[in-house]
C-alpha cells in the first residue's frame, strides 16, 4: 500500500526501496511535465513517477496524467518479461524526455533574449527567471535519477543480464548529457539575467536622475 501511495506525494524524492516481506521493489524517479499554471512562458516542473516491480508484475504510479506515460505505453517493443530491461527502458526514455525539453527551453530562452535586445523590460526578465527555475528543477531531478541509476541493480528483484549492458550504457550517457546540458544552460542564463538586470537598473537610475533634475529646475524661482 505504501508503495502505491508514496509516488502520489508530489514532495516524494527519488529513491529505491525493497520490501523483503512482499518481494516487491519500488523505484521513484522524477519526471518533467509542463507547468500548466504558467501561461506567460514555457516552463516545467517535476513530479514523482513510481515503478513497482516484483512477483512477475510491473506497475507504474503517477499522480498526474502526462504525455510521457501516454507515449511510452504506445510503444510496441516494451519488454515486461525482463524487469531489468523494462526499468532501463523507462529510465532511458525519461532521460531522452529531459533532453528534448531542454532543447525546447533553450529555444524559448533564445526567443526571450531576442525580445530583450529590442526592449529591456521586467516582463522579459521574469520570463527568463521562469526558464531558469525550470532548469533548477531539472538539475535536482536529474541528479536524483542519476543516484537511482547507480543503485538500480542492487535490488534483489532486478537481475542484471548481459544483454542489459548496452542499454545501461546508453542510459548513463543520456542522463549525463542532460545533466551537463542543464548546467550549461544555467550558466548562460545566469550571465544573461545578471547583465540585463544591471542594464535595467542603470536605465532606471538614469531616469530617476533626469526626473530629479527636472524637479529641481521646476522649483527654481523664475
Feature roles, as predicted:
Residues 1-78, 108, 144, 148-160:
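Helix-boundary and N-terminal cytosolic regulatory elements
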Residues 11-14, 57-63, 82-84, 89-95, ...:
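Short C-terminal domain-edge/linker segments immediately following a structured domain
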Residues 15-16, 44, 48, 93, ...:
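Generic detector of short alpha-helix boundary/capping microenvironments
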Residues 56, 107, 111-115, 120-222:
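Membrane-associated alpha-helical segments
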Residues 66-85, 110-119, 125:
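A short, charged helix-loop
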Residues 77, 100-103, 139:
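A short, ordered amphipathic alpha-helix with a cationic face
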Residues 77-94, 98, 160-167, 171:
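Long, non-coiled-coil amphipathic alpha-helical linker/lever segments
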Residues 85-109, 121, 128:
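Well-ordered alpha/beta subsegment
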